[in-house]
């Protein structure tokens, strides 16, 4: 009898835990900023945001820094970290604007990406870096390669910011949509045939984070194919696996909207 009732008890405990998960943060202020200052076809209006929206951005960061992330349901935790990463990256650029690239905000002329190592992200547990959020909280915490199309590093080659906040209740759908949009977009996957040779040109992200896609995404080619349009899938399948990957140069120019 005990053996039969134990699984039921465990299910009951899990249900109670889910029922008592904290409500996710209010991301409406983030939506308002995106609506006012961001156009995915043009970029972020950093100048206007710095001149008119910085108080709202600062207040949003203060509010998110009070969130007890561990009390949230798992999907809400991942949504929180993705939103916080994008909001914090935006704040880093605003604080150093005008600039031609987020890399130019680094204090080390040799290691031009050390801007991502500064403790610029406010959390309830204290300030951490953008790298901490990306690598420790998001990548290792959730092991989902789709996140690489959701976090934005303020560069032109980076997958665009989503025009809405990420939400735990819709997170899987949103992450799938981000991967699909990017891989079929202007900086996405492009097949080139030269005689019997077929090359698939893709973002450098799939090179930098190869292990994420191989370990958590079933392999780079499997992951890419899943999100391509039916027409591109047919072209890929016609190559019968004889496809070389080539990685595009990464454009670190700021994703700044033309003024």
Give a label for each model feature.
Residues 1-5:
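Positively charged n-region of N-terminal signal peptides that target proteins for export
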Residues 7-16:
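Bacterial N-terminal signal peptides
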Residues 17-21:
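Sec/Tat signal peptide C-region and signal peptidase I cleavage site
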Residues 22-82, 86-259:
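Interaction/scaffold regions that mediate signaling and macromolecular assembly across diverse proteins
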């Amino acid at each position: 009898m005990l053996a039969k009732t134990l699984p039921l008890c465990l299910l009951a405990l899990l249900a109670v835990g889910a029922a008592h998960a904290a409500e996710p943060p209010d991301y409406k202020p983030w939506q308002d900023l995106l609506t006012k200052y961001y156009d995915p076809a043009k970029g972020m209006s950093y100048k206007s945001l710095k001149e008119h929206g910085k108080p709202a951005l600062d207040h949003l960061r203060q509010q998110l820094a009070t969130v007890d992330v561990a009390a949230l349901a798992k999907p809400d935790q991942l949504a929180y970290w993705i939103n916080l990463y994008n909001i914090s990256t935006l704040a880093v650029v605003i604080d150093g604007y005008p600039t031609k690239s987020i890399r130019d905000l680094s204090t080390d002329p040799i290691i031009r990406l050390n801007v991502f190592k500064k403790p610029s992200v406010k959390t309830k547990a204290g300030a951490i870096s953008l790298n901490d959020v990306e690598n420790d909280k998001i990548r290792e915490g959730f092991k989902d390669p789709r996140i690489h199309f959701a976090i934005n590093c303020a560069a032109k080659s980076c997958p665009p910011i989503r025009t809405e906040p990420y939400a735990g209740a819709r997170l899987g759908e949103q992450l799938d949509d981000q991967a699909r949009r990017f891989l079929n977009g202007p900086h996405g996957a492009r097949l080139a045939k030269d005689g019997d040779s077929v090359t698939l040109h893709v973002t450098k992200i799939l090179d930098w984070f190869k292990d994420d896609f191989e370990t958590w995404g079933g392999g780079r080619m499997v992951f890419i194919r899943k999100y391509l349009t039916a027409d591109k899938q047919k072209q890929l399948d016609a190559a019968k696996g004889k496809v070389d990957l080539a990685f595009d140069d990464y454009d670190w120019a700021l994703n700044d909207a033309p003024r």
